[in-house]
Amino acid sequence: CVGMPGQTLEIKDKVIYLDGVANKEPDNVQYSYYVATKRPIGEKLRRELGISKEDLANHNANGTYYYLPLTQKAYETLSKRTDIVEKITPVVEEHGQGLYPVNKYTGWSVDNYGPLWIPKRGETIALTLDNLPFYERPIAVYEGNDLQVRDGKIYINGKESSEYTFTMDYYWMQGDNRHNSL
């Protein structure tokens, strides 16, 4: 669990911030890289780098161009292997697709995301058409309300609503393999 109810989460240049304070990264955090090699990465090096067989399978037909999640240690080890490696390039996503909320274009990416307030039971937010995409699913699906937008106005259970009080706590979960966690 990364974010707790009532906290504001933001990711800036891959660093997670909670309520404006940088979160310590786990020791084995992974980021994705494009890796061009002179020949396929062998089993011994795969094990040394801690790369799963599934991740190593993500390559081109001749096994010389990979999309790999690497820890800092694996990145440094692989960078020194000039006998195998031609180039390692960090994956940089300018604008993420399939990121929450999926019903609003935010311009956010997995490396630069938010800020997003995590709902807390008993807390009330001003509800606007601008922030509705962030909270529509919790309000309608998880808390079981009938939520509709008609003529530019928000209705919850048939009543026009400009605010909402959450009845449940929510959490932000994110794994160590950051580019495959959102």
Please describe what each predicted stretch is.
Residues 1-182:
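Extended hydrophobic leader/signal-anchor segments used for secretion and membrane insertion
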